[in-house]
Amino acid sequence: MLHKRITIIITLLLTVFTLSAQETLNDKMGNQRFRFIGPEGNRAIAIIGEPGNPMVNYIGAASGGLWKTTDGGINWRPIFDDQDISSIGSIDLAKTDPNQVWVGTGETFVIRPAHAMGNGIYFSPDAGRTWEHKGLEKTGRIGRVIVHPTNPKVVYAASLGHTYGPQQERGIYKTTDGGESWKRVLFVDEGTGAADLAIDPSNPNILYAGMWSVNINSWGLNSGGAGGGVYKSTDGGDTWEHLISKGLPGGTDRPVGKTAVAVSQSNPNVVYALFEIDSPELWRSDNKGESWTLMSQDHTWNERAPYYTRIAVGTDNPDEIYSMSVRFVQSLDGGKTRSPRPPRGGGDNHDMWIDPTNPDRMMVA
């Protein structure tokens, strides 16, 4: 009987201490705006978390592989080291099952010939424990992977291609059978690849692609061309429209360089596009891309454009927009004004993920 009482007392004390520790940790975390969660080492260029579960997050490195934490960033472990490639360009999780992980390889944040190439796209059915190579070996660099929100067999891949000459294997690719076969659904020309891709959360047949003409050699970088800019599809990628027809820059009269796109989750009518041009230009549409308004030409939005050019929209506020560049920039009025915000870890801000179930949970790589 005495042993039983002691056991009960110890159990109660451990419960009290555990709850107290959790409350203390939550109090401390609640007072922090951003905290460094690692991992240290290589340049992180892709990031995503499991929606609704702050313990599970993934980070992809430019040439350092794929890393995962299951304790909110306290510990990280490599989960891609047994594969033939270590350059991670993009990550996405299936909305219907977050254990289904897709990874595009190769870096699209490029300013020199030495940037790491990839060898296609990979799929894990078990949260990164095992991997299957799903093709697209010659695409070179996949900067964005998007899994259809309700059908995990449908996946899109935005391929930039290599950067040293003409190539057929670039553009937007689509699979409808979980990667067993792929169809190139958007091809502009042999010198223009896909730098970004966004999907309308209310109508996944609507897609926006940011296309980029770039050539890099040992004596310099040539960014921009008539094929660059924003393209839109309303039929799941079967057909596309170059949105110079809606007033956006691009085409032979006003060629653009690297282009980023983002759609508001809370109001999918709102779409943003950021262009590398003479002065960076941030544009906004309030009607799914039918018409556009120039919001800003502030250089801060897009410094050193080929190396950055990525934007994100707050998940509960269509006027809340972020830009990843030399500085991490936020606007709360749709891009009219901006203010650089922390973190300033090393001057490299490449990617951002905001939890669709919790707008206060956000991560920047």
Positions of PLM-derived features:
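Bacterial N-terminal signal peptides that target proteins for export
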Residues: 1-8
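Short, linear, compositionally biased motifs with a strong N-terminal bias
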Residues: 12-13
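N-terminal signal peptide c-region/cleavage motif recognized by signal peptidases
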Residues: 16-18
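Beta-propeller blade termini and top-face loops
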Residues: 22-365
